[in-house]
Every structure is written in C-alpha cells, then in structure tokens.
Amino acid sequence: SFFQSLEMGELLTKRGYDVRFVGYRDSSSTIVISSLVFCKKMFGGLYMELNSGPVVSDNSYLEKFFQSLRDYAKHEGVLELVVKPSQTYQTFDSNGQPLGFEDTHLIEMLTKNDFQYDGLQTGYPNGEPVWHYVKDLEGITEDTLVSSFSKKGKVLSKKANSFGLNITRLTKDELPRFKAITEATSNRRDYTDKPLDYYQDLFDTFSDGADFLIASLNLTTYLDLLHSQEDKLKKIAENLVQDLSINPKSRKKGNELREIESQIESFEQRKQNAEQWINKYGTSDIDIAASLFIYTKQELVYLFSGSLEEFSSFYAPII
C-alpha cells in the first residue's frame, strides 16, 4: 500500500506525527516483516497506529511481529495501539455478493494477543475508507480500458465523453480548486475533509507520484455542442419522416423516429439548463469534479475525490 511508502512517512512527519519504521528479523537476521507506524501525543501518553500494513515476506512470523509490536508500544509509553491491517478480510463482486468466506485468521490471532476487535465499519470513518474496490489492470491498455467496464460503466463513459469536459492536472498553486470540490462533497455527505495544507504537503511529498485532476465544463462550448448534436438528430428525424411517407407501415422506422424525437426533446431540456447555468455562473469554465490519484509500482490508488451535485448529470468522475 502507498501508506507504507517512504513518501507517506515524509508526509506524516510534515503533519506533525512521530514516524517510525519497525520490523521483525528471522534467526538469520533477515527482515521478514516491516512496517511504518506513526505516533501522536494523547493525554497521559502516546497513540500509535499501523495503517495498511505490515509489509510481509513470510506470514509465519506475523504473530511474533504483532507480539513484538505490542511489547514495543508498551515500552514506549503508548496508551493506545491501533492496527489497521492490509490483509483482505473477504472479497465481493461488483454487486456485493461474496466470492469467498471471511478470513478470520488474523482477527483471531490479534485478539488472542490482547488486541480488541472493533468490528466491520461502514461509511467514511476518520476520512478514510475501510472497504476497497479493486480492479486488476494487468493486460489492460488505454485502448481497451473502456471495454473492460461493466455494461453500465460503458454507457456512462460514453455519455461523459460526449459533453466536451476538460481534464486538467493541477499545479500546487491551483489546489484550492481541488479543495473547493472536496469540501463541498464532504459537507454534502457528512464526513470530514482534509485541510488545504494537507493536500499541499501531499503534492510536495509525492511529486510526480500523485495527480490532482479537475474536470471542468465551459458552458458556452457545451451549449454550442448541444446545438450541433441536436441539428444532426433533426436531420435524421427528417429522413425518417420522409421514409415513413413512402412506407408508413414500417414499424422499424416508426420506432427509430420515436427514439430520435425523444432524444431531441431531452436536448431541448439540456439547452434550457445550459442557458440557466450561463445566467447563473457566466461563461467561464466551471470545475465540476476532482480526483486525486497516487501511483506506486504495485497499484494506482483513487484516493480522494468529489463532485458538484448540481452537475451530476455529466458523470464527470468517470473520466
């Protein structure tokens, strides 16, 4: 996990945490388990946390590692040691159906060694997810990515890419644009957003290993696009009307015409919305969605994101 990286250690240090790297050696002094842990002061002692770890090359030493970590924490005056393991508890498909049984081995081992299990959580506790959606990217290229989506994902991707949205990689000075989106989202969904200086520190620490992306919309360009697309539909409708005048009993042509007329009607509504937004926001570009990606050798992490509910019909997060 990126959370066990040197960059994350540097970021946590910038944020005022006491960062430590701990490990366990086998009988030949080979490091078989290692982890980043971080501490902060609490009343009467220290709080210590191991998040998304440890990094393991030999699982047979896991119990000894956690026993040693527990003893080390006691020696350092830690009052609360929190472990958030990276091991998978259970795997589900995209519909939420389990693909296997719960793996309770780690929980049983930790509780046997005086740790208390807090149970499975939902939502966004402390601003971080405990449920992860994982997609295997092996063999997938930029050209084949969309074809790997679900049927719904393909439809939404096609729609999102038809609106003329612009994707921009932000500089550090532009991060307030990112913060404005994530803050609006956190207020709407009732969780605590990170402060702006956290995102700035992350930008500095991860450098090219992080992308802060913004999806923006130019309403004037969007309105022109709607006019152009509607004109094409009207020409198709005119041809269908002409075909039906020759063969009025053609069920196929009749169905096609009804579908095209329905699309034209939806374009009229979209144009009205666009004109209302122009009156409200003017003709400058509007930021409607934001996302932060972290890159490591093992994974690409879609870490933080947000979008404006008013523009949800553009499906900007998908692109």
Give the location of each predicted region.
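A conserved beta-strand-loop-helix scaffold within acyl/acetyltransferase catalytic domains
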Residues: S1-G44, Q90, F115-N126, V134-S313
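Acyl-donor binding region in acyl/amide transferases
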Residues: G45-E128, S262, T283, I288, ...
